[in-house]
Each structure stands twice: as structure tokens, then as C-alpha cells.
Amino acid sequence: MTDEFFNHLHERLLYEGLCDVGFSRIDETVPPDLARYHYAVTLVYRLSDAVVDEIDLSPTYAYFQHYRAANALLDRCALITCEMLRREGAAAYPIAASQSVHDRGDKYTGIYQHKSAAVAAGLGWIGKSALFVSTEHGPRVRLATVLTDAELPCGAKPMESRCGDCNLCVKACPSGAILGKNYVRGMERSEIFDAEKCSRHMKQAFGHIGRGAVCGLCMKVCPVGRSR
């Protein structure tokens, strides 16, 4: 595939509403049943500051709807990406923006971890909250991923955590699920974040907001990517 194709893909996805697109090689993180795919396209959508900034002691109805709408847009962009790659003769496999699977030993994980590809693409790092933190937009983003066997233009190096001594997300978490440790590549998520505790609290405290609980407090307080 040519540079012209990848430039066109990038421009098309930005036109569709994404804020960033990344390319990475994912041999170290792809699960065995998807090992035929050596590359990933990361799709990034920036959430509305106006909506996120309204989050205070709990998520809002507006944030719940915005979260779902962002996921729908990302899923649409993943399908567009797949079709554009298919027309070039490549195989492509879309990973939904938000879909948990229960057959991989962890009911709070997806088919493939979006943030693994995003970090490999050099777009940001994994924060103490276990959220992906974009260098430009902070954690105020949603992600989707397209796996492919097409050779993508990769050159960025994975980023290490830049959270340092900041513990704002740790203090903001109402469930105590964020353990306050900087993520280092190779760590299990459970070493920095208790997904079960987070999910349980969301369902109990915020389940009235809508089907499929959300929170967003840790994302809201992160200083990275805040609008000025």
C-alpha cells in the first residue's frame, strides 16, 4: 500500500470526526487467536469538554449519552477503515469501541485492548487509572481499533507513564479502585486498578443513569488534555 492511501485513510477518518489516528505493530500484544494480524489502526475520538466538565460527584445523563454516541461513531469509523483496507486487498478485523467478552478469563476485558495499540502507536500512555492518556487530549478520549494484515507505516516508540507523582485520579475515585501505581509495560491491569471494584460501584451508585453504567470522575480530574 502507498503513502497516498494511508494519507487518504487518515484524512477520511479526521473528516468523519476523529481527532487522531495511529498505526502500530502489535505482535507482542495480539492474542493467539488473532495472531494473523500483525498491525493495528487506532481510532481516537475526543470527548466534549462541555459534557465532561459537568461531571462532579457523579456522571451526568448527558455524559452517559455522549459516551454511547462516541462509541457508535468509533464503530462506524472502524467499519469504514475495514472497507478501505479490504478494497486494497488486505484483511481487516474491527474491534468494537466498547464490548466486554466473557470467554478470556476476565469479564472486564475486550477482544483486544485498544490502549495497547494506542500506546504502541506512540499516541500516549496508560495512566494510574488504567485509562489511556493521550499526549494531546489526556484521558478525555474514546478508542476503537482495526487489526489488519496490511503492513502499516509504523515508526513511533511506545510511551512510558508520565503520571509521575500526580494522584488526582486516585483521590477522585469513589470506589478506591485506583491503586496509585505508575504503569510499567508488562504489568497486569490488576496491579494498578481493581476493575471489579470499579464496576460494582458504578452499578450500585450510578446504575440509574442508564443501561450500562459509566462514571468518568477519574477522567474529569486528570490535568492532561484539559481545555484552557
Task: Specify the residue positions occupied by each region the protein language model found.
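Non-catalytic, usually N-terminal nucleic-acid engagement modules in DNA/RNA processing proteins
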Residues: 1-76
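Catalytic cores of enzyme domains
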Residues: 70-228
